[in-house]
A protein has these predicted regions:
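Intrinsically disordered, low-complexity terminal regions
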Residues: 1-288
Length: 288
């Protein structure tokens, strides 16, 4: 089944999907087009319209399958949706993987399945409870979460000063490359955390894992205030470190120091914490 409706370029679209893979793409057309393969019938419900044009500014895509559990949710072998590039999407799904490309903003929650987001310029909230979360070429405030999956972010930037990048997983790994937010919070309980990028002046960076390792791959001339705590693990840095304060107990070790050489402008503050894993800091030039 395929249907389309005229919409404003900045239309907000919400829907839920009970079953089926999901692909959402931005387009230059001022319409919302939906194709459900071998699935439930559906309809467009305009929750709000532009009074001048009559086009939808807030749209709910809902199933017309009748009463029952998840009765308002679309379902099928696959669901393909085309939206204006300035649109925002609010998606909840159960057993499905989602690929979202080239829309303004995305809010996604999936129970079983992975989430892939590309070219989302206005911010992301994505939670895959039993799947991976991957973000590429996107911007704005970003919050990513998963329970059992991994998180990968590549080429990501803030939209405004103060935008936060946050990633959290319980048993998966976190890998960040080219993430240029000045505020980054990344945490895992039993997985590793890896960062390949630059610490910007005045930035606040917090990387934490309980049972995994922390790996930083940064430019050779990096400088920051470093706060590190490691219980039964180890610490190693190839970049010179001047320790200012240090505390050693039976439960571990923590210190505050200057990594690299003092530069003009406020230094970034970097906090690295692990209970039983290792912390390693390497130069990007050594990885080439």
């Amino acid at each position: 089944m395929e249907r389309a409706i005229a919409a404003e370029p900045n239309v907000a679209v919400k829907l839920c999907i009970a079953e089926g893979t999901i692909r959402i793409n931005g387009s230059e057309r001022k319409e919302v087009r939906v194709f459900v393969r071998n699935g439930r019938k559906f309809e467009f419900r305009s929750l709000e319209k532009n009074p001048e044009t009559g086009k939808a500014t807030w749209l709910w895509i809902a199933s017309t399958s009748g009463p029952g559990p998840l009765s308002n949710c679309l379902a099928g072998d696959s669901v393909d949706i085309d939206l204006p590039v300035g649109a925002s999407i609010d998606l909840e799904a159960r057993t499905a993987g989602a690929v979202i490309d080239s829309v303004k903003k995305a809010n996604v929650k999936i129970v079983e399945g992975s989430i892939s987001l590309r070219n989302i310029s206005g911010g992301i909230q994505a939670n895959a409870y039993q799947g991976d979360v991957m973000v590429e070429g996107s911007g704005g405030p970003i919050e990513l979460g998963t329970t059992t999956g991994n998180i990968l972010a590549y080429d990501v930037k803030p939209g405004n000063v103060g935008d936060l990048f946050k990633a959290a997983t319980r048993s998966g790994q976190i890998a960040l490359e080219g993430v240029v937010h000045r505020q980054i919070l990344a945490s895992s309980i039993s997985g590793s955390v890896a960062f390949n990028g630059k610490f910007l002046n005045g930035g606040i960076y917090n990387f934490k894992t309980t049972n995994g390792s922390i790996r930083m791959l940064i430019p050779d001339d990096s400088a920051c205030k470093l706060i590190a705590a490691y219980g039964f693990g180890s610490f190693d840095s190839v970049i010179p470190l001047k320790i200012e304060t240090e505390n050693v107990t039976g439960g571990g070790k923590n210190f505050v120091g200057l990594l690299g050489k003092q530069t003009n402008g406020p230094l970034a503050t970097v906090t690295l914490t692990t209970s039983s894993g290792s912390i390693g800091i390497r130069k990007q030039s050594e990885d080439k």
